[in-house]
A protein has these predicted regions:
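Non-transmembrane alpha-helical segments in soluble domains
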Residues: 12-15, 35, 39-43, 98, ...
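An N-terminal domain-cap segment
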Residues: 1-28
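Short charge-dense sequence patches
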Residues: 11-14, 46-61, 86-99
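Acidic/histidine-rich alpha-helical segments that form the ligand environment
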Residues: 68-116
């Protein structure tokens, strides 16, 4: 599967069928909250919402190995940067949220085309280049697609 094509084209198509109030198979996010959460992850990959590394140096290599593997995120994988309650939605509609996701994916691709060789720190997994971010964003999109029964 072409991971970049999935996050750029296929995932947004899947989102078109998502009810903004849908409850996932696990977790507390609703449909639109998940879309906005994914958008935040994509914008982080371009250095926006930049976070320092939260993983201790002795663990970052092992964490990155997991991120680069084909092992899926487990349901309810904790995220130390998020509260136990989902963030309130910021877009008026799920269509607006999907449009923002699409905008951020394009910005992600353009950023790395303009800044070839750029490295952006992921707060859990360390320094990532374009290919590594693409792999992680794909893994993340698959995780939430399964959570909301889109796959």
């Amino acid at each position: 599967m072409d991971k970049l094509n999935f996050i750029k084209t296929e995932f947004p198509k899947l989102l078109q069928n998502l009810n903004p109030e849908a409850k996932g198979e696990w977790g507390v996010m609703k449909g639109q909250q998940m879309v906005e959460h994914m958008t935040d992850s994509v914008s982080q990959a371009t250095g926006k919402n930049n976070q320092k590394l939260h993983t201790t140096p002795d663990l970052v290599g092992r964490y990155k190995d997991f991120a680069m593997s084909d092992k899926e995120f487990k349901p309810n994988t904790p995220n130390a940067l998020l509260s136990d309650l989902p963030s309130p939605i910021t877009k008026a509609t799920i269509k607006d949220a999907i449009a923002e996701y699409n905008y951020q994916i394009t910005a992600f691709i353009n950023y790395f085309e303009t800044n070839r060789g750029a490295i952006i720190t992921n707060p859990f997994f360390g320094d990532f280049n374009f290919e590594e971010w693409t792999h992680l964003l794909h893994k993340h999109a698959i995780h939430h697609s399964k959570q909301f029964r889109l796959l």
